[in-house]
Amino acid sequence: MNWLRPSTLIDAFAPSEGPPPDSLYAFFLWSLRGAFPVMWVAGLLSALVGTLEVISAFVLGRIIDTALASGPEAFFSEHLGLIVFAGLFFVLIRPLTFGLSAAANGVAVQPNVNPLVLSRLHRWTMGQAVTFFDNDFAGRIAQKQMQTSRAVTDVVSEIINVVFFALASLIGAAIMLTAIDARIAAALTLWLFIYLALIRFFMPRIRVMSKARASARAMVTGQVVDTITNIKTVKLFAHHEHEDRAALKAMGTFRERAVDFGVMAATFRVALMTVAGALPVVLIGGTLLLWGEGIASAGDIAAAGAISIRIAQMTGWVSFTLMQIYANVGEVEDGMRTLSPPHTLRDDPEAGTLPAGSGHVAFDDVTFSYGRGAGGIANVSLTLEPGEKVALIGASGAGKSTLVSLLLRLYDTEGGAIRVGGHDVRDITQESLRRQIGMVTQETAMFNRSARENILYGRPGASEAAMIAAAEKAEAHSFILGLKDFMGREAYDAHLGERGVRLSGGQRQRIALARAILKDAPILVLDEATSALDSEVEAQIQLALERVMEGKTVLAIAHRLSTIAHMDRIVVLDGGRIVEEGNHRKLLAQGGLYARYWSKQSGGFIGLNDAAE
């Protein structure tokens, strides 16, 4: 019974098989797969509406001929059937068909095609490796998703509304004019060839300019979003003018591309109106000549006139629509370049699922340099037994975060292997791997959602009691109860702002700790987990962390050595290699790099420039 609910005829969030193709036609097929049956019905209804436009002129011509031949009295008495048919046609059949066509496109197709395409692009983009996002503006990527889905939707809607309608109208007009005289139909055909030649000349140029305009628009969005995202940094460095210049430069480029597009579009419309204006002259003039020869009737003149004026009017509409279609196709191509690249970090088709509770971690002769051939880490071998607490220390750039990123399989190793629970991370799915790892980082990631949603991100199905218990363990419960956002939402319902901007650094880290506590993964990664906390709160969090770490395999990165002195083992990295390894007492006794770091600290923090001598 879905036909009684046209808005449900297309599954607006159905996934598409495989990656987005890199050819335009195949990309449209990929984007719209599953929607074609409904789109065809909408197109055929639009074609029926176009046919009815021609029939309207035909009915008008027949009424005029019949009225002139019969006279006033006989016309109403002898041709009542024609009058009733004309009334039903114009009052009932034509409006009803128009309504069905509008509903098919406006209710069944448009509202569903946009989310269908957008959801497919969004899913594909989320599967990209972190390098994809590292190399582009976040705002630009989002703009490309929105732009491409909107452009595909507009192309579909315009083809249904205009192209199907126009083709049916032209075919019907040719048939009707042929019935009057083949020479009139031939004149229409000749005009149509001239019109198509005009289209063929202008449309590719409009498409190229639209692509350039779309690219420039996305750069403006990326620049503006980048500035707004980092607005505190802009203000702290008093760089309003610098950011303004950068934005105006991007806007200036967009303006230039928009002007180029506008000039081409205006030229096209002038040429178009010239060609369109010639059609009524040719068709009406030709029919008048035939009428003078006794071949055409007065009704034929009226029908030809109505058809020619309608087609001339439709020409502007169709041409503007075709210009929009080509412009949208250009925007789709521009979006494809950004969004369609294949995933560089893929699960093996035969990848398995990492069993729950896999706490054993092994780095086996791992090398990784971010594709640069130097830097990163080299030949690192490190084993973490289940339940063991291991700290990584070293100067900035020593390779600590690289090891963590490789463990999470945000990148693939360039040499060696990483195993979790005895499984090579390349042989298990990325999702199952990351479900077994909890993480708290120095730069805590917060969503602009409620405090509840941010904590439940660790385990979405957790109960309210479990969520609150996690917040209490992270020393976050008390400050959350005092939260209130600008919409009046309070406590756990209060939204935290973009990237948690309404919270202090310490509050954000406590939310992140609560999230990790709730996740309760067998492996816990702490990347400067308490760096943004004051001493009193840090002491409280350290106690909570010790409880959370019980029974878990822990890999902790720290510059403040006092926070990791109690770890089972401390691994010192320098220049991407392990240079020392042991517990706190052993490393101090060795008098090496760790001892030198420790001696430089008073409550301890490793400087940016500290390194092995």
Regions found by a protein language model. Name each.
Residues 1-53, 68-86, 101-109, 123, ...:
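Membrane-integrated ABC transporters
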Residues 33-34, 130-131, 147-156, 160, ...:
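An intracellular "coupling" helix at the cytosolic face of ABC transporter transmembrane type-1 domains
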Residues 34, 38-48, 93, 161-212, ...:
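Transmembrane helices of ABC transporter permease
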Residues 35, 101-102, 106, 110, ...:
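Juxtamembrane loop-to-helix connectors within ABC transporter transmembrane domains
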Residues 37-58, 83, 87, 105-106, ...:
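Alpha-helical segments in transporter systems
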Residues 121, 125, 234, 335, ...:
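Helix-loop junctions and hydrophobic alpha-helical segments within the transmembrane domains
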Residues 239, 263, 311-338:
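Cytosolic ends of transmembrane helices, especially the final helix of ABC transmembrane type-1 domains
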Residues 354-613:
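ABC-type nucleotide-binding domain
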